[in-house]
């Protein structure tokens, strides 16, 4: 006897079983779910997989998103603690890890998170050997290095979200000061995502007009307009948000979706993301820092050779030294 479905539908061909543009988010905490909803909102994949060790929350988040399927363009949303659910992912976003506490620097998080990655990364590679991994967990630059070492992937397929959000915060704060939309305020934060980041004042511009040419003291202690405070606000903003609401999630989720859009759509846009910088700007160690990078469907395909002033290069090297001082002591990688 025919079922209702068989009476309703005449099948012509078998459905494709392997997704074209599957995205996995590892970790369904505040950041992971902000990434997930931002990715869904941009219609970036034909399948979204969620994975975590917290089974009840994982199932609840999956069901909550599935119930909103009518309003989304990603028709398949799956979740499981078993990494088999992530198979055939094009991009894997890693947000898992222990949460940053109020007043805790990102670098203090490192050893607690390394052990988590020793389990996660091999599982990702087992089921999606051809994927690109985007690391979001903090401290993101060191954990991107850890991911690169554990995964065995080429460096262009291991990317850290890096200073994409720092630069967005910088441009927002510029826009508030100038009364111009952030998209028209151009500036770059490079180096470590966090306390030793570098503001490239020499490149800050609006419509091609160098702001440092208009105000040569910009970014220095001599500046009466105190532009240096803008970078200080960028560095402190995450701590401020954590103090107020307990965590950050929405801005990083939107930032991650921005990066995925560039890669999934092969847009070849330039983003300040974390990549292996050994041999660049006189940096001698294998550290990951943010530089302006071209992202495409292949991952991170090239780095823009930004002309930096001597003091900016010195700050970048100092940022590298800060990371290496911790990274060199990591074991079992």
UniProtKB/Swiss-Prot annotation:
Any one Gene Ontology molecular-function term assigned to this protein's record: L-lactate dehydrogenase activity
Reactions listed under catalytic activity: (S)-lactate + NAD(+) = pyruvate + NADH + H(+)
GO cellular component: cytoplasm
Domain of life: Eukaryota
Enzyme Commission no: 1.1.1.27
SUPFAM superfamilies, sorted: LDH C-terminal domain-like, NAD(P)-binding Rossmann-fold domains
Cellular location(s): Cytoplasm
Active site: 193 (proton acceptor)
InterPro entries documented for this protein: L-lactate/malate_DH, L-lactate_DH, L-lactate_DH_AS, Lactate/malate_DH_C, Lactate/malate_DH_N, Lactate_DH/Glyco_Ohase_4_C, NAD(P)-bd_dom_sf
Gene Ontology annotations of biological process type: lactate metabolic process
Protein's pathway: Fermentation; pyruvate fermentation to lactate; (S)-lactate from pyruvate: step 1/1
Record text on subunit structure and interactions: Homotetramer.
Family to which the UniProt record says this protein belongs: Belongs to the LDH/MDH superfamily. LDH family.
Protein's UniProt name: L-lactate dehydrogenase B chain
Organism the protein comes from: Alligator mississippiensis
């Amino acid at each position: 006897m025919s079922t209702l479905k068989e009476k309703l539908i005449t099948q012509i061909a078998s459905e494709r079983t392997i997704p074209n543009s599957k995205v996995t988010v590892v970790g369904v905490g505040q950041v992971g779910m902000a990434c997930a909803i931002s990715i869904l909102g941009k219609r970036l994949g034909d399948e979204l997989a969620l994975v975590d060790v917290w089974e009840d929350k994982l199932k609840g988040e999956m069901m909550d998103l599935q119930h909103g399927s009518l309003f989304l363009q990603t028709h398949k949303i799956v979740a499981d603690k078993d990494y088999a659910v992530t198979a055939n992912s094009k991009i894997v976003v890693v947000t898992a890890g222990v949460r940053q506490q109020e007043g805790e620097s990102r670098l203090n998080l490192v050893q607690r998170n390394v052990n988590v990655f020793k389990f996660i990364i091999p599982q990702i590679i087992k089921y999606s050997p051809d994927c690109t991994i985007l690391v979001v967990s903090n401290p993101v630059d060191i954990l991107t290095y850890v991911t690169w070492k554990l995964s065995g992937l080429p460096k262009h397929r291991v990317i850290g979200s890096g200073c994409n959000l720092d630069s967005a915060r910088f441009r927002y704060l510029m826009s508030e000061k100038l009364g111009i939309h952030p998209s028209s305020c151009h500036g770059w934060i490079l180096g470590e995502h966090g306390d030793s980041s570098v503001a490239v004042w020499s490149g800050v511009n609006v419509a091609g007009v160098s702001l440092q040419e208009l105000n040569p003291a910009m970014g220095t202690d001599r500046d009466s307009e105190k532009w240096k405070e803008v970078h200080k606000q960028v560095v402190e903003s995450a701590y401020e948000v954590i103090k107020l609401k307990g965590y950050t999630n929405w801005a990083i989720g939107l930032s991650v979706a921005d990066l995925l859009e560039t890669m999934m759509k092969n847009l070849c846009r330039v983003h300040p993301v974390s990549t292996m910088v050994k041999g660049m700007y006189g940096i001698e160690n294998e550290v990951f820092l943010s530089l302006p990078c071209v992202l495409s469907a292949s991952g991170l395909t090239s780095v823009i050779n930004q002309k930096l002033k001597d003091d900016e290069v010195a700050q970048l090297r100092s940022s590298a030294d800060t990371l290496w001082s911790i990274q060199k002591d990591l074991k079992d990688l």
